[in-house]
Amino acid sequence: WQPLEAHAANVAEMAAAFARPFASQAWARLLGELHDLGKARRSFQAYLSRANGLADADYDASDHSHSGAGACWATRKLGAAGRILAYCVAGHHVGLPDWIGGETPNGALAARLAEEAGVLDDPNVKAYVAAHEAAWRLPAPPFRFTDKGMGLSLWIRMLYSCLVDADFLDTEAFMDARRAEGRGSYPALDDLAAPFFAELDAKQRRAPATEVNRVRAEIRAACERAAEEMPGLFSLTVPTGGGKTLSATAFAFRHARKHGKRRIIYVIPYTSIIEQTADTLRQFLGDANVLEHHSNFDPEKETQASRLAAENWDAPV
């Protein structure tokens, strides 16, 4: 068995690392510490004992839910900030809940918190909290949300994603080390830039001196100049055959290096165009560094590494 404290610590640190790019490490770390607090309950420990053939007749093993305890602690101790954590903790196995409403009477978070409020009185939970809560502190949110609906919602979803991914990966590392090792490590985007531009420059030199190729070179140069600007929304309008894929990728590499971005993500409206784009990028970056992920992907092209990468988009492109 993996000790609860070890799992919580591992998930906390991994989630914090995932949240570092959007300055939310402390929030994600506390999510990791709280997410399985309910597993300290006597009833959950009885459930584990029964499931492993160990006698434990003193407690009811039928109730083995565990996500409510951390959510209850967060809302009780941290107020409005705690509700943000509560959404993520309560939903880390089943999806983010609504505050009110929901498909079932107790599916909404408000109802769940009211129903499970007594979980914090469990002696085991009390002991666990007493041993750890001195370190459970939060800074102010890293953003000022002018649009509290959309901005706050997206931030909660990002925190939730950090928690879910960290929880899954730490459990996988403990339960299935071979699968975890199969995830491999990908090169940083910066490491792919040099071979990409070397091949792109060579392709441009080999191209015959035609008017079309002159315009393609101008488009690429314009894209690379635009990459020096501050992050935001950019528009590229080029006729068919104008070299959009490679010019846009050149922009993406330059912009990522300039502003410390870690991924290039293509979101394209037709699977046929996704396939063409992915094939082009593989020629420049190699098969292993480009993840093609859409509903029409041919399973025969999949490898174990690509299936694992599709779970959390770890590939650089």
Model features per residue range: what roles?
Residues 1-203:
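Accessory nucleic-acid engagement/destabilization modules that flank
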Residues 229-236, 261-263, 315-317:
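Pre-Walker A (Motif I) flank of P-loop NTPase domains
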Residues 286-317:
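Inter-Walker segment of RecA-like/P-loop motor cores
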Residues 230-253:
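Walker A/P-loop
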Residues 261-284:
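Conserved Walker A/P-loop ATP-binding site and its immediately adjacent core
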Residues 69, 73, 88, 251, ...:
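Alpha-helical scaffold elements adjacent to nucleotide-binding pockets in ATP/GTP-utilizing enzyme cores
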Residues 7, 200-237:
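Conserved pre-motif I regulatory segment
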Residues 254-263, 285-289:
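Post-Walker A helix-loop "phosphate-sensing" segment adjacent to the P-loop in P-loop NTPases
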